[in-house]
Amino acid sequence: MLGPIRPIGRLWSSLMKSILSTKYQLEKGITIGLMTYLTKMRGGEKGPPFVGLIELWWSWLGSFCGIFACAFLSFYYQVPLLIGSFGASAVLIYAAIDSPLAQPRNLVGGHIISAMVGVTCFKLLGVTGFSCAMAVSLAILVMLLTRTLHPPGGATALIAVITPSIQPLGYYYVLAPAGVGALIMLLVALLTNNLANKRRYPRYWS
């Protein structure tokens, strides 16, 4: 009577050992994966050095002149040439001029492409949480594909969706303020950055 039961018992014991071993390996893998994931958040590299007074001066001068030029021309000609995302662009093209994200192709191309994406999302999807997320994420995707990644472009796309004063402009938003404003900022960057002996802008055009 016990003969047939013994193989079943051995099979059951082997199955339980296999399940426990798999469970252990799975838990071990999850633990290691979680620890690796959390370790990435520790950083570990040294922070950048402090900026010298001369660098502070040129960064201040460029950003002041760039934003002032857009604001002055906007008020004088009663044409929208200034949007909030230009404030973020000023940080890059006047204070982090060696960054690949600050080069002319990225500055102008990033704003124009993002403006087109933002307006399109607004026209097709209206003003919703989905359209806001789609505008920003799609703008990032297209900028990456076209080698025009410019972080302020995400804001340019979002502005097209959520700003009531911008919405009536439609695709004119791509021309002004996005396109023309970015060109004004670029012109000021070319003039001010290259006045400094140790600065050279841009690093490349294409």
In which residue ranges do the predicted regions lie?
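Hydrophobic alpha-helical segments of small multi-pass membrane proteins
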Residues: 135-142, 157-164, 178-183
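Active-site beta-strand/loop microenvironment that shapes enzyme catalytic pockets
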Residues: 116, 120, 145, 157-160
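Internal alpha-helical transmembrane segments of multi-pass membrane proteins
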Residues: 126-152
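Membrane-helix interface "capping/anchor" motifs
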Residues: 98-106, 143-154
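Short, electropositive, low-hydrophobicity segments enriched in small/polar residues
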Residues: 91, 114, 151, 157-158
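Alpha-helical transmembrane segments and their membrane-interface boundaries
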Residues: 2-112, 116, 120, 125-133, ...
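Transmembrane helix boundary and interhelical junction motifs in multipass membrane proteins
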Residues: 82-86, 150-156
